[in-house]
């Protein structure tokens, strides 16, 4: 994969249920308030450790607030050698609205 793929909330939820990796790029306060269970909070500070410990062949889904910033982050992960990276359209706002039961603080 040379470029990330944008996926819907429903596709992301299905992949998450199958064990897909979710990385959340929102600010620390937003992440602490609520996030996808099991998501990794990815920041400039946590990025090096995430990359060092990553399985580059495992699909990675990037979530932000509304699905815009995640596109740049997804493309960056592709440039770092990740094989399958997805940007979640609608972001966490859409996830929380559609799947409130699959949101944790």
Swiss-Prot record:
SMART domains: RHOD. Residues 16-104 form the Rhodanese domain. One of its GO terms (cellular component) is cytoplasm. InterPro entries: GlpE_sulfurtransferase, Rhodanese-like_dom, Rhodanese-like_dom_sf, Thiosulf_sulfurTrfase, Thiosulphate_STrfase_CS. The active site is at 64 (cysteine persulfide intermediate). One of its GO terms (molecular function) is thiosulfate-cyanide sulfurtransferase activity. Its main location: cytoplasm. It catalyses: thiosulfate + hydrogen cyanide = thiocyanate + sulfite + 2 H(+); thiosulfate + [thioredoxin]-dithiol = [thioredoxin]-disulfide + hydrogen sulfide + sulfite + 2 H(+). It is found in: Cytoplasm. The keyword Cytoplasm applies. It is an enzyme of class 2 (transferase). Pfam families: Rhodanese. Its EC number is 2.8.1.1. GO terms for biological process: glycerol metabolic process. The keyword Transferase applies. Keywords: Cytoplasm, Transferase. CDD domains: GlpE_ST. Transferase that catalyzes the transfer of sulfur from thiosulfate to thiophilic acceptors such as cyanide or dithiols. May function in a CysM-independent thiosulfate assimilation pathway by catalyzing the conversion of thiosulfate to sulfite, which can then be used for L-cysteine biosynthesis. HAMAP family: Thiosulf_sulfurtr. NCBIfam families: PRK00162.1 (NF001195). Belongs to the GlpE family. This is Thiosulfate sulfurtransferase GlpE. The gene is glpE.
